[in-house]
Amino acid sequence: VSGEVPGTDGGPMTSSEGGVRGRALTLAGVLAAAETAAPVESLDVVARILREHLGAVSVSFLITDFTGGSVVRLGAAGSVDTGEPARRITLRDTLYDDVIRTQQPRVEETGEDRRVRVVAPVTNRGDAIGLLELFLPAAPDAQVMREIGESAHALAYIVIANRSFTDVYQWGRRTKPLSLAAEIQHRLLPASLACEAAQFAVAGALEPADHVGGDTFDYTIDRDTVQL
């Protein structure tokens, strides 16, 4: 369900109405801010920027799990309990599922204090890493949606860069305990299970993700060929 909820002047909310006045959010700006923080705190930096700039009531990042059928909401730095499986949110027939499948952001009325919910895909070259979810005081205008899209794109790069330095993202993807064979097999898979370009698209997955029997796949891209 999409809806137009008025801003302060009866129209859609602009970024200047939502929070801190100033320049529009850009991919480069969000990346630069995240790089000043420790790898486990980069998500918190992006969330704080969005809260301050857009006046968002809440901002969260949801990462896709190994099964591809669920997402996991990652909290503030240090809140991931590695001793227990992460709490999974099943995707089927949800707004999250729609956003991941269509790779288009969605705006939904919540019915609470005229707030709206915005969910944007966090994707890099077809690799669906997760989702950016915000609750805003009013419906966003086109500029705000562009800024949210830029921030979601920045999050994809942030996760890709920082998952080499911390296990927070890996633990978030483990909604089921992995067998030893599955742990080893996942380490041998491509870092990104999908790649989309103008000339081709390739994607793969292991099923079941938590227990494998030796199957694997890989791909590499040369200037003129894709090798599988």
Roles of regions detected by a PLM:
Residues 1-36, 161:
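Signal-transmission linkers at sensory-effector interfaces
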Residues 67, 122-128, 222:
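Flexible loop/coil segments at beta-strand boundaries within sensory signal-transduction domains
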Residues 106-109, 114-123, 130:
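A short, aliphatic-rich beta-strand micro-motif
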Residues 130-140:
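Short beta-strand-to-loop transition segments that serve as allosteric relay/switch motifs
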Residues 31, 35-36, 43-104, 110-111:
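Structured interaction and signal-relay segments at domain junctions
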Residues 171-228:
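… and, occasionally, acidic/histidine-rich disordered N-termini of signaling adaptors
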Residues 140-160:
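Amphipathic alpha-helical "output/dimerization" segments
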Residues 19-22, 32-48, 173-180, 190, ...:
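Signal-transducing coiled-coil linker helices
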